[in-house]
């Protein structure tokens, strides 16, 4: 569960960064 949360958070951060760029 924790791993999934971290993965999801990391994915969201990547998406946010992509949008920011």
UniProtKB/Swiss-Prot annotation:
Key words, A-Z? Chlorophyll catabolism, Hydrolase
Which reactions fall under this protein's catalytic activity?
a chlorophyll + H2O = a chlorophyllide + phytol + H(+)
Q: What's the EC number here?
A: 3.1.1.14
Is Hydrolase among this UniProt entry's keywords?
Answer: yes
Please state what class of enzyme this protein is: hydrolase
Gene Ontology BP terms: chlorophyll catabolic process
Record pathway: Porphyrin-containing compound metabolism; chlorophyll degradation
Any one Gene Ontology molecular-function term assigned to this protein's record: chlorophyllase activity
Q: How does activity depend on pH?
A: Optimum pH is 6.6-8.6 for chlorophyll a hydrolysis, and 6.6-7.6 for chlorophyll b hydrolysis.
Function according to Swiss-Prot or TrEMBL: Catalyzes the hydrolysis of ester bond in chlorophyll to yield chlorophyllide and phytol.
The UniProt family comment states: Belongs to the AB hydrolase superfamily. Lipase family.
- Supply the name of the protein: Chlorophyllase type 2
């Amino acid at each position: 569960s924790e791993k999934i949360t971290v993965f999801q958070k990391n994915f969201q951060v990547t998406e946010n960064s992509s949008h920011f760029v």
